Amino acid sequence: SGIAAGAGQAQTLLWQAQVEDLLAQDTLLQTEVFGPLSLLVEVDDEAQLKAVVKALQGQLTATLHAEADDGPLAASLLPLLCEKAGRVLFNGYPTGVEVCDAMVHGGPWPATTDARGTSVGSRAIERFLRPVCLQNAPAALLPPALQDANPLNLLRLVNGQWTREAISSPH
């Protein structure tokens, strides 16, 4: 079913699936969809609901719609949802992504290829970084950030201690 879209709008869709198909890892049901779509899966009990959540692949977001008296069920679902999504919303919709330090717009695979990062916010630059070790590199070849003299006055972790001091040569 769906509501016809107006000019410049996406059509809203509501799909229904059998719980058995979702638990059997049906690829169509496991494909992340962007846009106004909801998938309705009716479960028999709390155990089946938890099995459905466990069967989900990684997602950017997961939303839990609950009322105050749903507290125990919500508390038991939260750890499962945290394993499946980079951002868990409560009684809300993931349509607005604020660009801020705390925002996480990522999640476990296949939502992202690296769940440690985010594509939004101040930490998004980390997606383009990767660690490289320069083991036993000659001092003349080291970039300024790695030189013993610390010419950039960077805060660095040296032998387990944070410091801006130059590293004295052991020779």
Pin down the residues of each PLM region.
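NAD(P)-dependent aldehyde/semialdehyde dehydrogenase
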Residues: S1-L60
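C-terminal segments
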Residues: I3-L14, Q59, T63-H171
